[in-house]
């Protein structure tokens, strides 16, 4: 059956950045996507990353931040999390393109002889591969529907050597599909000098000059600053950078990232783009988003949620966890203040008491390696004994099981990840992961990745939270609960194994009954990846809701 939608060319919007990194290109792109969706357009997004890694899966969290996992099991840049949350749609493997992926594909083609003996070069072979991946995002889906708009964020900063092939590919895309079907947005810093009390435009002028030097004239500029950029300076930048006055947009720092679409709307960026690209549109329907902003900016309650992690020196390592906690807060009209707690501080009862006292709820997120594990277990013990609501994620479930096993008399309970010679390995390496763990197979892209189904026990707390006994969550792990110890742990502690894989083999959820603890739930999955600011994830929602109830009825 063919689609009834009118056939029109997909429009491509490229978002670049200049002057400095971490300007918020991803948030700008995601906010624009949300704004265009509110205009009735279908939008998809893509991140072009210039690093040589095939994906960020093997990168240090301190170096890269969070690895965001998609439904189809791709390990991707954290910006894809922003895209999914703002667009409220799932993205896949093709939404993250890295230099490593591109070169791997091109070299594999060369080895197969697909270039017919030609000298393989950055131009045209690398740029052609990048172009193909960009244009593929605009192809029709299984139902014959193509997106109206593809927004591609080019990682890095204009002027970086690594970014040049991607920028050249974007330039060629504009040439091939027509200027009327392509739009370039450049994000730039407008610094404020306190000594002179002035905003400086020169960095932006030089950044645009650098971009023009490689053949790209931006259609719009998003000016990042710690304050509003006055109209006079915007007009000056428009003149000096040869950009339409309407295309120069001020985007000052905001108290919440979810205010950014409204900022861009008030600057009329969407109107300018729609007119330039000849897109159909309707009046903005922001009923859902404005309800979110009301909850973000006018909360009725306030809670403090502790995140007990190993990588807290770089909060971006837990970006989706933080946003999932905040989304649960919004759903409960609550401002959730995040307190970062290094797991090492919770190794002793006195350390846990000092670090965790006064918290309304605790999240124990994922991680790898032995450092800080006893602290995570100590935090779980403290939460269990003091009836503090706690949610464990991935490694958080494994630590919850180890803590329960020690209650059940398995005093040496541990994981083969931390101690390959453990005498009571209540957490063990998954059979299909043993080659990777032993070094006989690649580490990259070989974990249990992506969405997997689970069956929940009828009448369990997790089944009540989800409202069903059949669920699907995203995963990223190599280790699992050792089934040889399940019965002993269940008999010797109050822990309930409340959800498993459909075949009953893999433990996916554990919990304590409500009469034992108000809310101590853990999952082998990463539910934070499926949370949306407008649709809080059930497990995070339950955590915040229980914490609020305990505030009222301790």
Swiss-Prot record:
Alphabetical keyword list: ATP-binding, Glutamine amidotransferase, Ligase, Magnesium, Metal-binding, Nucleotide-binding, Pyrimidine biosynthesis
Catalytic site positions: 394, 526, 528
Regulation: Allosterically activated by GTP, when glutamine is the substrate; GTP has no effect on the reaction when ammonia is the substrate. The allosteric effector GTP functions by stabilizing the protein conformation that binds the tetrahedral intermediate(s) formed during glutamine hydrolysis. Inhibited by the product CTP, via allosteric rather than competitive inhibition.
Annotated positions binding UTP: 21, 200-205, 236
UniProt-annotated binding residues for CTP: 21, 160-162, 200-205, 236
GO biological process: 'de novo' CTP biosynthetic process; pyrimidine nucleobase biosynthetic process
SUPFAM superfamilies, per the entry: Class I glutamine amidotransferase-like, P-loop containing nucleoside triphosphate hydrolases
Any one Pfam family match given in the protein's UniProt record, by short name: GATase
InterPro entries (UniProt xref): Class_I_gatase-like, CTP_synthase, CTP_synthase_N, GATASE, GATase1_CTP_Synthase, P-loop_NTPase
Recorded catalytic activity of this chain's protein: UTP + L-glutamine + ATP + H2O = CTP + L-glutamate + ADP + phosphate + 2 H(+); L-glutamine + H2O = L-glutamate + NH4(+); UTP + NH4(+) + ATP = CTP + ADP + phosphate + 2 H(+)
EC number: 6.3.4.2
Gene Ontology, cellular component aspect: cytosol
Metal-binding among keywords: yes
Molecular function GO labels: ATP binding; CTP synthase activity; glutaminase activity; identical protein binding; metal ion binding
Binding-site residues, Mg(2+): 79, 153
Pathway note: Pyrimidine metabolism; CTP biosynthesis via de novo pathway; CTP from UDP: step 2/2
Annotated PROSITE patterns: GATASE_TYPE_1 (PS51273)
Sites where the protein binds ATP: 22-27, 79
Limits of the Glutamine amidotransferase type-1 domain: 304-553
Database matches in PANTHER family: CTP SYNTHASE (PTHR11550), CTP SYNTHASE-RELATED (PTHR11550:SF0)
Additional note from the record: CTPSs have evolved a hybrid strategy for distinguishing between UTP and CTP. The overlapping regions of the product feedback inhibitory and substrate sites recognize a common feature in both compounds, the triphosphate moiety. To differentiate isosteric substrate and product pyrimidine rings, an additional pocket far from the expected kinase/ligase catalytic site, specifically recognizes the cytosine and ribose portions of the product inhibitor.
Family the UniProt entry places it in: Belongs to the CTP synthase family.
Protein function: Catalyzes the ATP-dependent amination of UTP to CTP with either L-glutamine or ammonia as the source of nitrogen. Regulates intracellular CTP levels through interactions with the four ribonucleotide triphosphates.
Subunit structure: Homotetramer.
Protein name: CTP synthase
């Amino acid at each position: 059956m063919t689609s009834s939608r009118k056939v029109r060319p997909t429009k491509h919007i490229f978002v670049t950045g200049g002057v400095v990194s971490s300007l918020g290109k991803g948030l700008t792109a995601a906010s624009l996507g949300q704004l265009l969706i509110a205009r009735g357009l279908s939008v998809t997004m893509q991140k072009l990353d210039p690093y040589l890694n095939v994906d960020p899966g093997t990168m240090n969290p301190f170096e890269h931040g969070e690895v965001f996992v998609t439904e189809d099991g791709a390990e991707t840049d954290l910006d894809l999390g922003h895209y999914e949350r703002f667009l409220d749609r799932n993205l896949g493997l093709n939404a993250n393109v890295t230099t490593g992926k591109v070169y791997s594909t091109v070299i594999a083609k060369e080895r197969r002889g697909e270039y017919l003996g030609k000298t393989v070069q950055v131009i045209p072979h690398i740029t052609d591969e990048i172009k193909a991946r960009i244009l593929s995002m605009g192809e029709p889906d299984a139902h014959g529907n193509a997106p109206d708009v593809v927004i591609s964020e080019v990682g890095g900063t204009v002027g970086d050597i690594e970014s040049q092939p991607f920028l050249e590919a974007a330039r060629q895309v504009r040439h091939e599909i027509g200027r009327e079907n392509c739009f370039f947005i450049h994000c730039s810093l407008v610094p404020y000098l306190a000594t002179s009390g002035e905003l400086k435009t020169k960095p932006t002028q030089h950044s645009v000059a650098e971009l023009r030097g490689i053949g790209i004239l931006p259609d719009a500029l998003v000016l990042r600053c710690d304050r509003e950029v006055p109209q006079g300076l915007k007009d000056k930048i428009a003149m000096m950078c040869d950009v339409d006055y309407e295309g120069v947009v001020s985007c000052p720092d905001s108290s919440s990232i979810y205010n950014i679409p409204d900022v861009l709307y008030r600057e009329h960026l969407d109107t300018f783009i729609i007119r330039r690209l000849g897109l159909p549109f309707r009046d903005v329907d922001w009923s859902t988003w404005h309800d979110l902003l009301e909850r973000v900016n006018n909360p009725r309650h306030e809670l403090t949620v502790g995140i007990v992690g190993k990588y807290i020196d770089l909060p971006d390592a837990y970006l989706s966890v933080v946003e999932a906690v905040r989304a649960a807060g919004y759903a409960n009209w609550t401002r959730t203040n995040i307190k970062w707690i290094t797991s090492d501080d919770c190794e002793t009862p006195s350390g846990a008491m000092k670090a965790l006292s006064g918290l309304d709820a605790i999240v124990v997120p994922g991680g790898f390696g032995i450092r800080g594990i006893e602290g995570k277990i100590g935090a779980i013990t403290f939460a269990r004994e003091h009836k503090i609501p706690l949610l464990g994620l991935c490694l958080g479930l494994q630590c919850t099981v180890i803590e329960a096993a020690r209650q059940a008399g398995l005093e040496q309970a541990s994981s083969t990840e931390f101690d390959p010679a453990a005498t009571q390995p209540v957490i063990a390496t998954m059979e299909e992961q043993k080659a990777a763990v032993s070094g006989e197979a690649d580490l990259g892209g070989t974990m249990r990745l992506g969405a997997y189904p689970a069956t929940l026990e009828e009448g369990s707390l997790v089944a009540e939270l989800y409202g069903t006994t059949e669920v699907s969550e995203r995963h990223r792990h190599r280790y699992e609960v050792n089934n040889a110890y399940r019965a002993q742990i269940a008999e010797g502690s109050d822990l309930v194994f409340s959800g498993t894989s459909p075949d009953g083999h893999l433990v996916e959820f554990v919990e304590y009954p409500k009469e034992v603890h108000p809310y101590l739930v853990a999952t082998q999955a990463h539910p934070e990846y499926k949370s949306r600011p407008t649709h809080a994830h059930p497990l995070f929602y339950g955590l915040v809701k229980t914490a609020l109830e305990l505030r009222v009825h301790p």
